[in-house]
Amino acid sequence: GPMGIMGPRAGEDGHPGKPGRPGERGVVGPQGARGFPGTPGIPGFKGHNGIDGIKGQPGAPGVKGEPGAPGENGTPGQAGARGRVGGTGPAGARGSDGSVGPVGPAGPIGSAGPPGFPGAPGPKGEIGPVGNPGPSGPAGPRGEMGIPGVTGPIGPPGNPGANGISGAKGAAGIPGVAGAPGIPGPRGIPGPVGAAGATGARGIVGEPGPAGSKGESGNKGEPGSAGPQGPPGPSGEEGKRGPNGEPGSAGPVGPPGIRAGVMGPPGSRGSSGPAGVRGPSGDSGRPGEPGIMGPRGIPGSPGNVGPAGKEGPVGIPGIDGRPGPVGPAGARGEPGNIGFPGPKGPTGDPGKIGEKGHVGIAGPRGAPGPDGNNGAQGPPGPQGIQGGKGEQGPAGPPGFQGIPGPSGTAGEVGKPGERGIHGDFGIPGPAGPRGERGIPGQSGAAGPTGPIGSRGPSGPPGPDGNKGEPGVVGAPGTAGPSGPSGIPGERGAAGIPGGKGEKGETGIRGDTGNTGRDGARGAPGAIGAPGPAGATGDRGEAGPAGIAGPAGPRGEVGPAGPNGFAGPAGAAGQPGAKGERGPKGENGPVGPTGPIGSAGPAGPNGPPGPAGSRGDGGPPGVTGFPGAAGRTGPPGPSGITGPPGPPGAAGKEGIRGPRGDQGPVGRTGETGASGPPGFTGEKGPSGEPGTAGPPGSPGPQGIIGAPGIIGIPGSRGIPGVAGAVGEPGPIGIAGPSGARGPPGGVGSPGVNGAPGEAGRDGNPGSDGPPGRDGIPGHKGERGYPGNAGPVGTAGAPGPQGSVGPAGKHGNRGEPGPAGSVGPVGPVGPRGPNGPIGPRGDKGEPGDKGPRGIPGIKGHNGIQGIPGIAGQHGDQGSPGTVGPAGPRGPAGPSGPAGKDGRSGHPGAVGPAGVRVS
């Protein structure tokens, strides 16, 4: 049935998406309420400037504002570097076979199509043996350590704005349905072969898909009637043989290939590709005149046997077109484009062998019937057991080539019969003469990798290969034990300072942490220089004036009464006008030193200081004597084969070495066993029959004599000079066919004639199913461990270890002796909070301080390790089969082929009775 809709292609990872523009900053929340100022104390005598008061408790943090709306998607940035190619995902499940659609009418004959695409490169040859690694070069001297640069001052951090909440990532859209494949156009003229591309990394073999349903077998067609046999034609002249060429010199040995990684599990057998369109047959040349046989050339030495190429995939048989006349042989075209692989059907059960019918009398050839629809291809039957080949008898004498007989009407194409059980394979006979190379068919799609064969014996070491490019840096291994420290080299000059790195992207701001406890108050710092006077702020509005009462006379001052209880705090009055600042009072006497307050809680750890300069290396230790080599332990078990590593990049092509001497001629290898025969191809179209000549008159029948005794065949004489070919005599009228007589007894086999000329090679049949995997060879015995190598040189000093954890705090020391009376001591412990006083006026804003020095831009962070490629999605269902393309123009008719060699002579019938 037609193929289902083709699913999305699996394989490479797409380009990474472009990063979106960061969202807008969220709205900053309102500022928290300001705490109430304390109650003003009773103004006392102005003494010395007191110690600065303790800072009041900070107000509660304001409520975080609502996050701003997510910003619009920004302009896409530049595309990032392309990610590594992902591994091939598992093969998707095979979709169900679609229903068989109706066959459309044949389209009109289209014009010649445009030139086709360049053909795919041929299969890659097998990888040659890997050469022995060359000796390691001596380790270079260690470079001098540069002087560390001076750490720049850290600028004041800016106020980072609150980042808005990132918008939610949209859901991935549903992948669109792949469109149906277009109508295939006519096959164009093959284009030139393109340059072979670099071989890609080998993908992981996917799991085999489920087997498809079994197709129905077609009905067996009726045998067609045979046409009349034409008279023999004249024989052509034999062409002269050319001299043998001198043997060519052997080519240079190619560089060894890159060693492949560990192969994955065996994959399923690939599906068959479509069969290529058969090209027109070539025109037979005129027979040449027989020339004088030249001297026999010096036999060339057999060349080295090259590696066997990989077997190509089997293509899906295409739809048979109507047979056209055979055209002249065209120039060999370039290989066509690779077709899409079709689904592989399951191996069906062998069909039942039908009963052999009786051979009827051959009737006249009927008129050609219409081409029937091609039935569904049945599943291939199981491979039969290979049997022994029978003995090949001597070839019979070549028959005379008759004049083509009259063309009979083409009979109706019969339906293909059921495939019978494959017979035994015979012993392979001697190879026949090589036929002309057929026109290459359209290349089928490359099937999945076949199963891994057993490992063959190791070949001789090849020449040292070119040094490849460094491979992908692997994950850092565990640090080994530190080697002995080398002698420190002289300190080199300071390196050129690196370029300023790009500013990293601002990260998402974290949530505000809880407010920590106040640490112990530090010693008062030195009084800084007064800043520039700020601009005078606007004066506040004056409050409403109270009603002025009448001024009474001032009374005498009475004695002071006892202090009463403190009354409740009155309502806050309106702020009065700001008074002028009084003159600075004189410093009072220094008070006695107060007792030392208890130690406050430990404050948080400060930021880490800049890294100190690296100290000078210690003197090198004395190298100890190498210890005696220990006894070689027993070989450990083989480890599990790890997963295949990523293939390294192809190395640069090295300088071509001088041509080596030609090695001795190797012995000819034994002839391998014959492979299984391919499937029997469908019956080809019948050629156009020639016009019949006039039949000749039958001659008188003589007396049939008894067969003589077969004599001993004489030695082959020297061939005489070929005489001129006589003109054929007139052909008599054919007499009426007589009644069929009873079959005679089986006579003794006649003498086999000389072998006839080999006919032209037929079209290559489709590749047969792969043979069964051979029995894997036994693993060779493990060799004895080699002798221990010499002691290696000391390695370079390892990297500096990380800073260890901080040690525990020591016990507190005993208090020392009391010192002399010093200046004013530190502030004592904080007293209880006083009652909340009225809210004071808002102070005037001070001048904006100078902007701090911008900080040095930090280095870019270490780039993260790329993530693991995600799995590929399931393979979609197969797409529908497109309609058949237009039919191409018919080619010119070719010359008639030569008749095959004649069969064995039949048995001699009984002697006839002469009628007087």
Swiss-Prot record:
- Originating organism: Orycteropus afer (Aardvark)
Q: Name one Pfam family in it.
A: Collagen
Q: Note the subunit structure.
A: Trimers of one alpha 2(I) and two alpha 1(I) chains. Interacts (via C-terminus) with TMEM131 (via PapD-L domain); the interaction is direct and is involved in assembly and TRAPPIII ER-to-Golgi transport complex-dependent secretion of collagen.
Q: Where is the composition biased (Low complexity)?
A: 96-114, 190-205, 261-281, 361-377, 448-457, 469-491, 515-577, 593-602, 623-632, 700-711, 785-800, 814-824
Which branch of life, at top level?
Eukaryota
- UniProt biased composition (Gly residues): 83-92, 384-393, 612-621, 741-750
- Has UniProt tagged this entry with the keyword Glycosyltransferase? no
Coiled-coil region: none
Q: Which family does it belong to?
A: Belongs to the fibrillar collagen family.
Give a GO molecular function annotation for the protein: extracellular matrix structural constituent conferring tensile strength
According to the UniProt entry, which residue ranges have a biased composition of type Basic and acidic residues? 10-24, 839-850
Region ranges (Disordered): 1-167, 183-711, 732-916
Ordered alphabetically, the record's keywords are: Calcium, Collagen, Extracellular matrix, Hydroxylation, Repeat, Secreted
Q: Does the keyword Calcium apply?
A: yes
Q: What is this protein called?
A: Collagen alpha-2(I) chain
What InterPro entries does its record include?
Collagen, Collagen_superfamily
